[in-house]
A protein has these predicted regions:
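Juxta-kinase regulatory segment immediately upstream of eukaryotic protein kinase catalytic domains
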Residues: 1-58
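ATP-binding pocket architecture of kinase catalytic cores
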Residues: 32, 53-171
Length: 171
């Protein structure tokens, strides 16, 4: 549970060389392939676009997000668009790889570039969002969320750029 995490995290170094940097990458060792079989395939960009264009009886958080396409039967979310960057997939992957026990982040199954659009394939995390639950949260709930977010921020602050290999704030 996040609430009982230690707050004295050891600094973790992150280098661009440790990040997967291909335009098209699939993490065959991810839970998607463990759960669906080694020969399972992620939806192609054409399939994602087709699903995004299909009229849906979807309400809530998915109703107004054409750039986030859920594939509920596969427990898969594909985020895509021309303003999306592979760096977002790299960041999610790096945070889960280095801080996964302390920072809740969806598992990334892969990403690809198709023309000027990037597609990031990730775990579909189901449940209520804070936005949806806001009106029903008690002061105790708010305090717990505050503590959890505090520990998450401390964990994120433990990430450091490798000396001589800085990439954040470089441009």
């Amino acid at each position: 549970m996040v609430d009982k995490m230690e707050t004295n995290h050891q600094a973790l170094e992150l280098s661009p060389a440790s990040l997967p940097n291909d335009d098209n990458i699939t993490f065959q060792d991810s839970s998607f392939f463990r759960n669906h079989g080694a020969h399972a395939e992620l939806p192609t960009p054409a399939m994602v676009r087709e699903e995004a264009a299909r009229p849906k009886n979807v309400t809530g958080r998915w109703a107004h997000k054409p750039w986030a396409v859920p594939f509920f039967s596969m427990k898969l979310l594909v985020k895509y668009g021309s303003s999306l960057s592979i760096a977002e997939g790299q960041c999610l992957w790096a945070i889960r790889t280095t801080l996964g026990q302390h920072v809740p982040v969806p598992e990334v199954y892969g990403w690809c570039r198709d023309g000027n659009e990037v597609f990031i394939y990730m775990e579909l995390v189901e449940g209520r969002t804070l936005e949806d639950a806001e009106d029903t949260l008690t002061q105790t709930d708010h305090a717990l969320i505050h503590r959890q977010l505090h520990h998450i921020v401390i964990s994120l602050r433990s990430l450091r750029q490798a000396p001589g290999d800085s990439f954040i704030g470089k441009f």
